[in-house]
Amino acid sequence: MAPFKQNAKNKGPIRGKQFNNKFQRGGLSHNAKRKRKWVPEDKVFDGSLKEGQGFAFKRKEKVKHEYNKLLRKERKRKQESKVQLQEEYPEHLKHLYLAERERLDEEEQEKKKKRCKGRAVEEDIEEDDDKLNKDLGSSSSEKNITNTSTDQTIAPASSNEPAQPESSHKTTFFQRKQNISSYQKTKQEYERIKEERARKREEILKDKAQREEALKKYKEKKIATYQLLKRKTKKGQPNLNLQMELLLQKIQAQRK
């Protein structure tokens, strides 16, 4: 008797898994569009009995895929916003935006120039202060020399008269108001920060030592309780008497 299908003479037996792989989800044309992972025929699920069925791995891959999608969307949105800020100004207001931008740039340049000028003025003031201090020092030394010479000449004539007070050149305006230079200010600030850091370091080391000591005591206590509770009876059962003693000790400690 002839077979029911004439074309099925020379073909081998149809296997269920291969048939399903070819024609499931829209047929051959659908499967040809996307790549499919090769899975052995005897493997029903991903993973193994020892490692599990791969649920955690699938979940991780899904989360990673979603995260990458979000990153792509965020990147695309940022690029679009940049293009919009640069190019898509309204035509009737574009000149206003450009003028505002130029004004802001000019203000920034003026601020930079002022900052540079302020630094130069500070340096000039420091140089003038140094020069004034040097001049004051030289003038005071010259006056001291002249005073000593005049005292030596007048001393034999007026030996019984009391010595006159010193001149008031020491209480001048420049000596009363000596500005601290920026270098001295920075040095004082550096010393203060250094002391603060040393104090904080000492506090951190002290806290660390206290923490380590507390952890050590806690571990010793835990080991002692474990050594006490791991004892068993002759039959291999846990010793309830020791557990009751431990509970009593805890209750007494709480009452204290």
Swiss-Prot record:
Short name of any one Pfam family annotated for the protein: rRNA_processing
Superkingdom in the source lineage: Eukaryota
Cysteine pairings via disulfide bonds: none
Amino acid composition bias (Polar residues), ranges on this chain: 136-185
Chain intervals with Basic and acidic residues compositional bias: 89-104
PANTHER family reported for this sequence: THYROID TRANSCRIPTION FACTOR 1-ASSOCIATED PROTEIN 26
Protein name: Thyroid transcription factor 1-associated protein 26 homolog
Transmembrane parts of this sequence: none
Region listing for Disordered, in residue ranges: 1-35, 72-190
Gene: ccdc59
Similarity section: Belongs to the TAP26 family.
